[in-house]
Amino acid sequence: MSKKILIITPSWIGDCVMTQPLYRRLHELHPGCTIDAFAPKWSMAVFERMPEINRVIENPFGHGALELKKRWRIGRELGKEGYDQVIVLPGSLKSAIIALATGIKQRTGYVGESRYFLLNDIRKLDKAALPLMVDRYTALAHPTQADFNGHSDNPCFTIDPESRQAALAKHGLATDKPILAFCPGAEYGPAKRWPARHFAELGRRYLAEGWQVWLFGSQKDFEIADEINQLSDGLCTNLCGKTNLPEAIDLLSCADTVVCNDSGLMHLAAALDRKLVAVYGSSSPDHTPPLSQKAKIVSLNLDCSPCFKRECPLGHTDCLNKLTPDRVQKAAEELARSA
């Protein structure tokens, strides 16, 4: 009888993308297994693009919400589904409470927030041995970290052509001209955001060559995207806050080149196999790089970076302000030539 596995997923979009190689490895180790994902509503579309996932179940809890009684009740309901194993990917105590409530015999995950009494297949994370987040996830497919070969596949999403065409029609877009996609937001803070004026300068160059420039992001990113558009003579298409996540994924898959900050959309673009230039400032690609053979990372590698701060502690954000559009354009052109 095939194994049935429940995954309690991370919340952040980028982290969700990086879990896909785990599911592929589970299928390799347990042929014919069934994998269901228990995921927040805002990230469900990510798992729906993964052929390894059988079913996506909505996790109703937001960031920081405890709601202990509700967690226990939902865990008990999940336990009726006949799972053989639950793998808890977040390191939080509250995520493991749900796993305990399910009564599933094998409850797998890292120690995290001292979860010794909640999980019974508990792993101690050797961060030095597994610096990449994707490998930390994939290693959980194996009985021990020592059994993991140290290699994870890259995420790779599926796209439904009809769904993509519907998204294009809904937003009045066409693919008759090459598309440059900008993802100018970064949820963590301004120290991860390349300046609007740099995005705009790069956009103007591509617009002059007959390209389209589409701007992607949430409603929170609308203001910076609008600034980029205004600095580009209003010739860009600002999609920030106008698409839901499934539409954003479909439309991003149309892009010929993507330029973005270290963000969830960066990981989506990588999983969609787009030519991708990832701009790094306060963060580091050593832990969560774009997982794609078509990605180039651009960073000044200043002595003060990565600082991992939301805002520049020195007040200048030179790591991004001094990273010129020329550098990013050169990386994009190198990708185009290698295609």
What are these regions (language model features)?
Residues 1-339:
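Catalytic machinery of carbohydrate-active enzymes
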